[in-house]
Protein backbone atom coordinates (compact mmCIF):
# COMPACT_ATOMS: atom_id res chain seq x y z
CA UNK A 1 0.00 0.00 0.00
CA UNK A 2 2.97 2.32 0.46
CA UNK A 3 3.04 3.52 -3.18
CA UNK A 4 -0.60 4.67 -2.99
CA UNK A 5 -0.69 6.18 0.52
CA UNK A 6 -1.08 9.72 -0.76
CA UNK A 7 -4.06 8.76 -2.88
CA UNK A 8 -5.66 6.79 -0.03
CA UNK A 9 -5.37 9.77 2.30
CA UNK A 10 -7.01 12.05 -0.28
CA UNK A 11 -10.07 9.84 -0.76
CA UNK A 12 -13.28 11.38 0.54
CA UNK A 13 -14.26 8.27 2.48
CA UNK A 14 -14.38 7.27 6.13
CA UNK A 15 -13.60 3.57 5.70
CA UNK A 16 -10.99 1.62 3.74
CA UNK A 17 -10.94 -2.14 3.28
CA UNK A 18 -7.40 -3.48 3.11
CA UNK A 19 -6.18 -7.04 2.58
CA UNK A 20 -3.52 -8.31 4.96
CA UNK A 21 -3.40 -12.10 4.78
CA UNK A 22 -0.92 -12.07 1.92
CA UNK A 23 2.71 -10.98 2.23
CA UNK A 24 2.21 -8.89 -0.94
CA UNK A 25 0.13 -6.46 1.16
CA UNK A 26 3.26 -5.37 2.97
CA UNK A 27 3.75 -4.29 6.56
CA UNK A 28 0.89 -3.08 8.73
CA UNK A 29 3.11 -0.19 9.81
CA UNK A 30 1.54 1.51 6.79
CA UNK A 31 -1.39 2.31 9.10
CA UNK A 32 0.80 4.93 10.83
CA UNK A 33 0.66 6.96 7.62
CA UNK A 34 -3.11 6.92 7.09
CA UNK A 35 -5.46 9.66 8.22
CA UNK A 36 -6.52 9.14 11.82
CA UNK A 37 -10.21 9.54 10.94
CA UNK A 38 -10.18 6.48 8.66
CA UNK A 39 -11.71 3.24 9.86
CA UNK A 40 -9.98 0.17 8.48
CA UNK A 41 -11.77 -2.95 7.29
CA UNK A 42 -8.92 -5.32 8.08
CA UNK A 43 -8.67 -8.28 5.75
CA UNK A 44 -7.73 -10.89 8.33
CA UNK A 45 -9.13 -14.12 6.84
CA UNK A 46 -7.67 -15.68 3.71
CA UNK A 47 -10.04 -16.36 0.84
CA UNK A 48 -7.63 -18.84 -0.74
CA UNK A 49 -9.00 -22.37 -1.14
CA UNK A 50 -7.50 -24.81 1.35
CA UNK A 51 -6.16 -22.11 3.67
CA UNK A 52 -8.28 -21.91 6.81
CA UNK A 53 -6.85 -19.41 9.28
CA UNK A 54 -7.20 -20.54 12.88
CA UNK A 55 -8.86 -18.29 15.44
CA UNK A 56 -5.44 -17.70 17.01
CA UNK A 57 -3.95 -16.68 13.64
CA UNK A 58 -6.76 -14.20 13.05
CA UNK A 59 -6.41 -12.77 16.56
CA UNK A 60 -2.65 -12.40 16.08
CA UNK A 61 -3.15 -10.61 12.76
CA UNK A 62 -5.60 -8.16 14.35
CA UNK A 63 -3.31 -7.62 17.33
CA UNK A 64 -0.56 -6.66 14.91
CA UNK A 65 -2.89 -4.01 13.48
CA UNK A 66 -3.64 -2.83 17.02
CA UNK A 67 -0.03 -1.70 17.32
CA UNK A 68 -0.98 1.08 14.90
CA UNK A 69 -4.76 1.51 15.20
CA UNK A 70 -7.20 1.87 18.07
CA UNK A 71 -9.77 -0.93 18.39
CA UNK A 72 -12.56 1.48 17.44
CA UNK A 73 -10.96 2.01 14.02
CA UNK A 74 -10.89 -1.67 13.06
CA UNK A 75 -13.58 -3.84 11.54
CA UNK A 76 -12.83 -7.44 10.61
CA UNK A 77 -13.46 -8.90 7.20
CA UNK A 78 -12.08 -11.54 4.88
CA UNK A 79 -9.55 -10.53 2.27
CA UNK A 80 -11.35 -9.80 -1.01
CA UNK A 81 -14.32 -12.15 -0.89
CA UNK A 82 -15.60 -15.59 -1.72
CA UNK A 83 -16.82 -14.61 -5.18
CA UNK A 84 -18.90 -17.26 -6.88
CA UNK A 85 -17.58 -18.00 -10.35
CA UNK A 86 -14.08 -16.77 -9.59
CA UNK A 87 -11.03 -18.88 -10.38
CA UNK A 88 -10.56 -19.60 -6.67
CA UNK A 89 -13.12 -22.29 -5.91
CA UNK A 90 -13.80 -22.33 -2.18
CA UNK A 91 -16.40 -24.80 -0.92
CA UNK A 92 -19.32 -23.49 1.11
CA UNK A 93 -18.25 -25.68 4.03
CA UNK A 94 -14.79 -24.10 3.96
CA UNK A 95 -16.27 -20.59 3.70
CA UNK A 96 -18.48 -21.34 6.72
CA UNK A 97 -15.46 -22.54 8.73
CA UNK A 98 -13.44 -19.45 7.79
CA UNK A 99 -16.27 -17.13 8.81
CA UNK A 100 -16.95 -19.01 12.05
CA UNK A 101 -13.27 -18.58 12.95
CA UNK A 102 -13.50 -14.87 12.17
CA UNK A 103 -16.57 -14.52 14.40
CA UNK A 104 -14.83 -16.33 17.27
CA UNK A 105 -11.72 -14.17 16.84
CA UNK A 106 -13.92 -11.08 16.94
CA UNK A 107 -15.58 -12.31 20.14
CA UNK A 108 -12.20 -12.88 21.81
CA UNK A 109 -10.88 -9.51 20.71
CA UNK A 110 -13.97 -7.68 21.95
CA UNK A 111 -13.65 -9.43 25.30
CA UNK A 112 -10.03 -8.39 25.59
CA UNK A 113 -10.16 -4.84 24.18
CA UNK A 114 -13.67 -3.51 24.88
Give the residues covered by each predicted segment:
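Domain-level signal for soluble alpha/beta catalytic cores
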Residues: 1-114
Amino acid sequence: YTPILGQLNRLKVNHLTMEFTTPAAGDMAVFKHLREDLEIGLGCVSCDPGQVDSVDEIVARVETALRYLTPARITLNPDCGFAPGSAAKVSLDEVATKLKNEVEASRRLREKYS
